[in-house]
Design a protein with these regions (language model features):
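Polysaccharide-binding and catalytic clefts of secreted carbohydrate-active enzymes
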Residues: 160-302, 308-311, 315
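Secretory targeting signatures
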Residues: 1-58
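Catalytic domains of carbohydrate-active enzymes, especially glycoside hydrolases
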Residues: 90-115, 188-189, 302-305, 367-372
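Aromatic-lined substrate-binding rim segments of carbohydrate-active enzymes
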Residues: 95-96, 108-146, 241-264
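Boundary/entry segment of secreted carbohydrate-active catalytic domains
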Residues: 59-95, 99, 274, 350
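Substrate-binding cleft of secreted/luminal carbohydrate-active enzymes
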Residues: 301-322, 329-401
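Active-site-adjacent "subsite" loops/lids of carbohydrate-active enzymes
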Residues: 73, 86, 127, 136-187
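Short, surface-exposed linear motifs at loops/turns and structural transition points
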Residues: 402-508
Length: 508
């Protein structure tokens, strides 16, 4: 795969457009964070990392959902609304009504970055309009590759700052936390945060802070300090060592986003617009972009992932095709179909026409993905003079079977048995996967002499009832007493498959 950006690499914002953003640094005093030297990536342990999200049920309990998360739906149908919309007259109510007619259940709105946010009145109007139509509102945050601030810009290995939109992940840490606190503090009804552009470039960052942090890590792991920095520059003998380490400061930002957002709103959904995997290559994004999606999934920092599958061709095991993207993402990123977290395909205008888009959606469904997001909105409610393509012909071309939700999971356990019940909003099958061991793990592997995290599914015991019902009940027998079991429930119907996260029960 070459180093070119995919179709989602937008042009920079227009100068007049920037004036509409509210500077976050003017609203909050900087959050002072104590700088902690980055730990070695090789020290990450399965025992201490969040390989599953769990709710422990001792003996008897109930996992109730005041609000069923979108990750528990049989198919997620989203539309991305790019920041270009703010440059044109637009009506959020008309946009929401339009998308509701086509069965869209979530929008991902590009309304803030590390340093700026759209006016709160604009965001409130948008959230209210979509919520009125039963559509979730996920705020999309531009990360370190698309946030403007010359003062914290990344430094390349020659000492220059050629791109003020490319940020140093160490310098922006307090700004990232402030941005999340500010956004959720002002818009607590937001349903999710999508992390976008959380990646760096080949030549970044070599600022003093990065050099000091890397030097300390290098000393702790190799027993010596850096004596010749040239060896760690791109295409030089030790660049792979630096390239692998530089994922750590970026990953720290994702952890900050997760921890801050969840502390303010525990049920908020954190997602990522990720660089896709092409042609069975699991290291490109980590080596060349500093984007460690596998680590973020392993740690539980993101709840769902949407790789950018901006390709026109569907079939082909190699090259930039939809098939190769899905093959690689399921293989390395989620641990297979109905994997560790929901896997969505970012698609849309890249398909060129409505007929091809319908074919893409049919293929995505046939491969068992958990949904899709259309990039990007144009149509009723936006007067862009044709700049933003009307997507309604695309949406009209696809079939939209009714989707359902899964929730109200309850467990009643004895010494040797456990009965698990749940409900679905439409009739569907019943299935439970359980094991005394974790259902997913992550392994530190190499490809092309470069390391990466791979998510693996360790299949457990399966109990299944193919009878369609909305009230589901399965009893696990032959269990050990006073033992912890990992499990997840799943239901399948005409509208797709809904799967819970990995949960825990404990027998008496």
């Amino acid at each position: 795969m070459n180093g070119k950006l995919p179709a989602k690499s937008f042009s920079r914002r227009k100068k007049e457009d920037k004036q509409e953003w509210e500077p976050l640094q003017n609203q909050f005093s900087a959050i002072v964070l104590v700088s902690i030297m980055l730990a070695s990536i090789f020290s990450v342990s399965f025992a201490t990392s969040s390989l599953f999200k769990s709710i422990t049920i001792a003996n008897q309990g109930r996992i109730g959902f005041l609000k069923v998360p979108i990750t528990y739906k049989s198919e997620i149908r989203g539309v991305f609304i790019h920041e270009a919309i703010y440059s044109y007259p637009h009506n959020w109510t008309i946009i929401a009504q339009t998308l509701a007619r086509y069965g869209i259940d979530a929008v991902f709105v590009n309304d803030f970055d590390i340093f700026h946010r759209r006016p709160d009145s604009e965001i409130t109007t948008a959230i209210n309009a979509f919520h009125a139509m039963g559509i979730e509102y996920h705020a999309c945050m531009n990360g370190i590759a698309e946030s403007y601030n010359p003062d914290t810009a990344a430094v390349n290995y020659t000492g220059g700052k050629p791109d003020p939109y490319a940020q140093c992940p160490i310098k922006v840490k307090p700004y990232v936390e402030a941005a999340i606190r500010n956004y959720i503090g002002n818009h607590s009804d937001v349903d999710g945060i999508m992390i976008d552009y959380m990646r760096t470039g080949v030549h970044y960052c070599y600022c003093d802070e990065h050099r000091a942090a890397f030097d300390q890590w290098y000393y702790e792991n190799y027993g010596e300090h850096v004596s010749n920095w040239t060896e760690f520059y791109p295409d030089q003998p030790k660049w792979n060592i630096y390239a692998s380490w530089r994922n750590e400061p970026v990953s720290e930002l994702v952890k900050i986003i997760h921890d801050t957002a969840k502390s303010l709103k525990p049920d908020i959904v954190i997602s990522e617009a990720a660089w896709s995997y092409f042609s069975d290559c699991p290291t490109y994004w980590r080596k060349w972009l500093g984007q460690d999606t596998g680590r973020w999934i392993m740690e539980g920092w993101i709840d769902m992932v949407a790789p950018m599958m901006y390709v026109e061709e569907i079939y082909g095991k190699t090259g930039e095709t939809l098939e190769s993207c899905i093959d690689a993402c399921q293989k390395y990123m989620t641990g297979g179909v109905e994997g560790k977290i929901p896997l969505l395909a970012f698609t849309g205008l890249c398909t060129k026409n409505a007929t091809n888009f319908a074919a893409h959606i049919n293929y995505i469904r046939s491969r068992g993905l958990d949904g899709w997001i259309f990039w990007r909105y144009g149509g009723p409610g936006v007067e862009s003079g044709g700049y933003l393509t009307d997507i309604t012909p695309y949406l009209e071309a696809i079939t939209m079977p009714e989707t359902f939700k899964l929730g109200n999971i309850q467990v009643s356990a004895s010494e040797t048995e456990a009965t698990i019940t749940w409900t679905t909003t439409l009739s569907a099958t019943s299935r439970i996967e359980y094991s005394i061991s974790q259902l997913f793990n992550a392994t530190w592997e190499t490809w092309g002499n470069f390391p990466y995290w791979r998510i693996n599914h360790i299949q457990g015991n399966i109990l299944e009832n193919l009878t369609y019902t909305t009230d589901h009940s399965i009893t696990l027998t032959g269990l050990n007493s006073k033992t912890q079991y990992y499990f997840r429930v799943q239901s399948e119907g005409p509208g797709g498959t809904a799967t819970s996260e990995t949960l825990i029960l404990t027998t008496k």
